[in-house]
């Protein structure tokens, strides 16, 4: 089997040598995709879809890589990287280069395989899309999820319709019926509806499953003509519905191994006009079985339990099957290789001549049903309303040709003529012809009973003797040999039976029933008298071969006799292997085309012909090993020459030595049950069986006794071992105790020595520590001394800097003080001038007020005198006038007091302003004085001695003079204010004094 790893390649060949699917279980190629870019090194394929031609398909893995595989051109190409897993694919659109892919984000995209560009992006689903169904025209598509199904127009990529359902009822699948305009919708409650695509009118509804059936439909498949619907689920039953009659017409029960059906698909056939008869059923064990829905026979199967299938897709023309395996790889199967043994020849066109009279019908009730223009397979005639007609037979030659007429309507003589003309049967129809020639009954029940008995004890260790690489092939061989051994006891002791059956097992490994019946038919007919001298080789058969060889080639036989080569050397190896060791596959098939088409003696004649055709190399052989090697290995011999020689021997051999006179004619296996095979020395076989049984029983008894003795011996040994272990343990404990004591003493001595060394080391460390501390102390003192010296230098530098700054500040301060003194003297003169002016103004106002009061008093006196004179005129008027005058006087006095108060307030404000300015100058002078006061004593003395004498005297006497001056000034201002206030009060309190 070829395997192709896509790796990181974007294109390449699918296979690098011509596939041979017939020798590899029908597998053309196995495709895997491994990469190092992602964490999982093997990328699993998830979905596959074929195009309309059936020669190309697309496949997508779980990382979103989509490849196109062209089986006709042997090429693959990476067409898209979607970066997310695809959940469904469709590749049969109207534009052949476009395909649909449903992604994990619930969207559907359309890509082009040629340009590798995005054509359209469709959204609308709210859950994962599980299937895409495309209309036969390629213009419409239905995408199905668990909650909805949507109909899309692929010309505009717009959604046309949407199928919504209740949440309690989920959608199982919605798809188009092939070659029709009908949509089939299947729901999780087993309801199935058919809708018109254009109007969405409900055409019909299928009734529910029959009572007693608890199957829930999960998977569906429809034939190409759209007439039959197959449904399955978690059961081994399949329901077949007739969509035209809208009824269930058949229930197929799969084998008991099948517990659930995961996928269904019909196998298309070019000759059935769309009414597919073969249904592929993928079950939970990963095996896909193909059954005939009419005969309910298992035809073949793909996949194994070890290498199970996850999903499969069949090409539209039925040539290929693409299966995604459970390990994530992709297998491509050839349907022709899988069905080569069951293929039937195309039915010829026939012409109905006339009806056969009823009185000429033989005991067989078989009749050939004639459909319009075709010949059907034979069927038993029952009471039926359908009229049947049969071909007219040659009544005169009926008895002669009776044995040449096969059940399938083939004529043995015509086949022999065809075989002689072409040398072999057509590869496509060989298996069908063999089954017809051997007249296999296909007893399913009988074969199942043999298989159900399990593997025979004689073949349990078959793999050790015959190590076959293919597990499936070994399993089929073991099952076939076990069935033969259960059928007849002789085959459990036949050593060459695996060699005899292996070619047929390899040829019919997909159909074990046919394989068993072919081998059984071969043994009954072509292995006649082989077991009469069991367990020795068939001496009588070998004698026949030797007699024929003596008649046709005495020289060669004499050469064998001279070299002590018996028939067990030159004949028996060919018979027990049926020429499989000396011929290739094609040569072997060609030979058995002739063997099955002739009398059983043809096989014995073939042995003679093989030797006579090889007489030249055989005459040159002298050693027995050379002869043995010759008859066990392939030789440069033309099989066509051998076959022609066989026919020549069959015709020219005398009747007295001809094997056909000693061998019976062909006898087919009986229908229903297999015949009893007892053509062997029963007493020998029974004796051997009894001996084997006795030996087996003795061996079992011996094994049981040996097991008992071994158990007892094991118990004794175990007890002895326990005792010995206990003594050894005690001895070890004693020795360990002594050793521990010695170790303890040694450790104590070592401890004392270590303590002494530790004390010495401790003393040394203390001394070192003292020295180190002393050195550290000295180092610290030196460091502190250096730091103090550095600080002193820093302080000296700081003092010098501050002295310089102080000198500069003092000089600047002296200048500022001189300037300030001048300013203050100017302000003092200004203030004195203002004060004099204000005093003069106040005195002037007082004088004016005094003069006014005097004039007013004189006027009042004058008026008083006048009033006295006019007192006779009325006392009330005088009294009112007096009150008015007093009010006027009070008003004038208040006005003057207010003016005097305002003048005093203004003067006091000016005094306070000048005092504030003087107060602002005092802190600055005091700060300068304090800075000089905080200098060090030595420095202050030094500075005073260095200062100018005039500056020193000024700085010492200036504060005292200023304080005296300020005090005198404030005192004068306060006295003046006091006098003015007293005068104002006196003038306000005693106005009558002024009047007097």
UniProtKB/Swiss-Prot annotation:
Annotated transmembrane regions: none
Cell location: Cytoplasm, Cytoskeleton, Microtubule organizing center, Centrosome; Cytoplasm, Cytoskeleton, Microtubule organizing center, Centrosome, Centriolar satellite; Cytoplasm, Cytoskeleton, Cilium basal body
Pfam families: RabGAP-TBC (PF00566), WD40 (PF00400)
All copies of domain Rab-GAP TBC, residue ranges: 424-599
Any GO CC annotation of this UniProt entry: ciliary basal body
Gene3D superfamilies tied to this protein: Ypt/Rab-GAP domain of gyp1p, domain 3, YVTN repeat-like/Quinoprotein amine dehydrogenase
Gene Ontology biological process terms, A to Z: cilium assembly
Entry coiled-coil feature ranges: 388-414, 699-844
Keyword Cytoplasm: yes
Keywords recorded for this protein, A-Z: Cell projection, Cilium biogenesis/degradation, Coiled coil, Cytoplasm, Cytoskeleton, Repeat, WD repeat
GO MF entry, a single one: molecular adaptor activity
Database matches in PANTHER family: TBC1 DOMAIN FAMILY MEMBER 31, WD REPEAT CONTAINING PROTEIN 3 WDR3
Role noted for this protein: Molecular adapter which is involved in cilium biogenesis. Part of a functional complex including OFD1 a centriolar protein involved in cilium assembly. Could regulate the cAMP-dependent phosphorylation of OFD1, and its subsequent ubiquitination by PJA2 which ultimately leads to its proteasomal degradation.
Subunit structure and binding partners: Interacts with PJA2; the interaction is direct and recruits PJA2 to centrosomes. Interacts with OFD1; regulates its activity in cilium assembly. Interacts with PRKACA.
Identification of the protein by name: TBC1 domain family member 31
This protein's encoding gene: Tbc1d31
């Amino acid at each position: 089997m070829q395997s192709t790893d896509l790796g990181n390649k974007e294109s390449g060949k699918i296979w690098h040598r011509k596939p041979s699917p017939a020798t590899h279980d029908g597998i053309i190629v196995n495709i895997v995709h491994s990469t190092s870019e992602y964490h999982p090194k093997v990328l699993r394929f998830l979905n596959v879809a074929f195009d309309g031609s059936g020669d190309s398909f697309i496949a997508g893995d779980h990382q979103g890589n989509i490849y196109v595989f062209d089986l006709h051109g042997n090429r693959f190409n990476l067409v898209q990287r979607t970066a997310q897993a695809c959940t469904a694919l469709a590749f049969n659109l109207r534009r052949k280069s476009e395909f649909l892919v449903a992604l994990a984000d619930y969207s559907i995209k359309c890509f082009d395989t040629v340009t590798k560009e995005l054509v359209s992006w469709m959204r609308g689903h709210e859950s994962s899309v599980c299937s895409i169904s495309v209309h036969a025209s390629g213009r419409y598509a239905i995408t199905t999820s668990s909650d909805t199904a949507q109909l899309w127009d692929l010309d505009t990529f717009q959604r046309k319709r949407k199928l919504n359902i209740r949440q309690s009822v989920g959608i199982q699948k919605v798809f188009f019926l092939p070659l029709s305009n009908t949509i089939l919708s299947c729901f999780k409650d087993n309801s199935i509806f058919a809708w018109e695509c254009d109007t969405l009118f409900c055409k019909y509804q299928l009734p529910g499953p029959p009572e007693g059936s608890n199957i829930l439909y999960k998977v569906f498949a429809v034939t190409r003509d759209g007439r039959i619907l197959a449904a399955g689920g978690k059961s081994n039953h399949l329901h077949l519905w007739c969509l035209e009659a809208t009824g269930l017409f058949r229930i197929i029960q799969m084998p008991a191994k099948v517990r659930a059906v995961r996928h269904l698909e019909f196998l298309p056939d070019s000759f059935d006009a769309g009414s597919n008869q073969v249904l592929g059923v993928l079950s939970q064990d990963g095996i896909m079985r193909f059954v005939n829905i009419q005969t309910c026979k298992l035809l073949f199967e793909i996949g194994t339990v070890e290498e199970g299938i996850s999903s499969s897709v069949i090409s539209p023309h039925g040539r290929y099957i693409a299966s995604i395996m459970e390990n994530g790889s992709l297998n491509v199967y050839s349907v022709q290789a899988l069905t080569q043994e069951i293929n039937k020849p195309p039915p010829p066109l026939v012409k109905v001549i006339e009806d056969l009279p009823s009185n000429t019908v033989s005991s067989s009730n078989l009749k050939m049903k004639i459909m319009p223009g075709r010949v059907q397979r034979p069927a038993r005639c029952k009471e039926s309303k359908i009229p049947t007609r049969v071909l007219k037979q040659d009544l005169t030659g009926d008895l002669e040709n009776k044995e040449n007429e096969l059940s399938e309507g083939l004529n043995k003589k015509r086949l022999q003529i065809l075989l002689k003309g072409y040398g072999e049967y057509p590869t496509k129809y060989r298996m069908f012809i063999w089954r017809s020639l051997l007249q296999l009954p296909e007893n399913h029940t009988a074969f199942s009973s043999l298989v159900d008995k399990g593997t025979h004890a004689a073949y349990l260790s078959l793999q050790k003797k015959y190590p076959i690489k293919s597990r499936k092939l070994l399993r089929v061989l073991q099952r076939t040999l076990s069935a033969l051994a259960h059928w007849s006891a002789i085959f459990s002791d036949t050593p060459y039976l695996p060699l005899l059956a292996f070619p047929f097992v390899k040829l019919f490994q997909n159909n074990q029933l046919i394989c068993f019946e072919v081998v059984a038919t071969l043994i009954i007919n072509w292995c006649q008298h082989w077991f009469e001298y069991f367990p020795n080789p068939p001496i009588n058969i070998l004698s026949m071969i030797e007699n024929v060889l003596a008649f046709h080639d005495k020289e060669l036989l004499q050469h064998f006799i001279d070299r002590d080569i018996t028939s067990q050397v030159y004949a028996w190896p060919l018979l027990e292997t049926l020429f499989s060791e000396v011929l290739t596959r094609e040569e072997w098939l060609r030979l058995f085309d002739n063997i099955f088409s002739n009398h059983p003696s043809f096989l014995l004649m073939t042995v003679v012909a093989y030797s006579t055709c090889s007489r030249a190399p055989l005459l040159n052989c002298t050693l027995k090993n050379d002869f043995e090697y010759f008859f066990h290995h392939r030789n440069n011999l033309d099989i066509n020459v051998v076959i022609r020689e066989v026919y020549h021997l069959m015709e020219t051999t005398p009747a007295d030595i001809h094997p056909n006179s000693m061998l019976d004619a062909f006898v087919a296996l009986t229908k229903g049950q297999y015949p009893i095979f007892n053509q062997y020395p029963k007493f020998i076989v029974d004796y051997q069986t009894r001996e084997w049984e006795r030996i087996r029983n003795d061996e079992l008894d011996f094994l049981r006794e040996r097991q008992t003795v071994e158990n007892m011996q094991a118990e004794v040994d175990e007890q002895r071992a326990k005792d010995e272990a206990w003594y050894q343990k005690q001895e070890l404990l004693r020795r360990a105790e002594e050793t521990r004591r010695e170790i303890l003493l040694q450790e104590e001595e070592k401890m004392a020595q270590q303590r002494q060394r530790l004390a010495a080391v401790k003393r040394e460390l203390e001394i070192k520590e003292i020295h180190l501390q002393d050195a550290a102390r000295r180092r610290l003192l030196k460091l502190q001394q250096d730091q103090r010296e550095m600080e002193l230098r820093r302080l000296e530098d700081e003092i010098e800097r501050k002295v310089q700054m102080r000198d500069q500040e003092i000089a600047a301060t002296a200048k500022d003080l001189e300037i300030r003194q001048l300013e203050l003297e100017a302000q003092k003169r200004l203030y004195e001038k203002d004060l004099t002016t204000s005093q003069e103004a106040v005195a002037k106002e007082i004088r004016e007020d005094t003069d006014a009061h005097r004039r007013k008093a004189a006027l009042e006196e004058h008026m008083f005198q006048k009033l006295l004179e006019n007192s006779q005129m009325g006392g009330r008027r005088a009294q009112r006038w007096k009150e008015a005058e007093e009010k006027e006087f009070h008003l004038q006095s208040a006005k003057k007091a207010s003016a005097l108060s305002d003048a005093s307030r203004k003067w006091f404000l000016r005094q306070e302003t000048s005092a504030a300015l003087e107060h602002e100058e005092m802190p600055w002078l005091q700060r300068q004085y304090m800075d000089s006061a905080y200098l060090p004593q030595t420095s202050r003395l030094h500075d005073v001695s260095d200062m100018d004498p005039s500056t020193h005297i000024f700085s010492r006497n200036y504060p005292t003079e200023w304080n005296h001056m300020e005090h005198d000034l404030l005192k004068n201002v306060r006295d003046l204010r006091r006098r003015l206030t007293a005068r104002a009060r006196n003038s306000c309190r005693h106005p009558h004094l002024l009047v007097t």
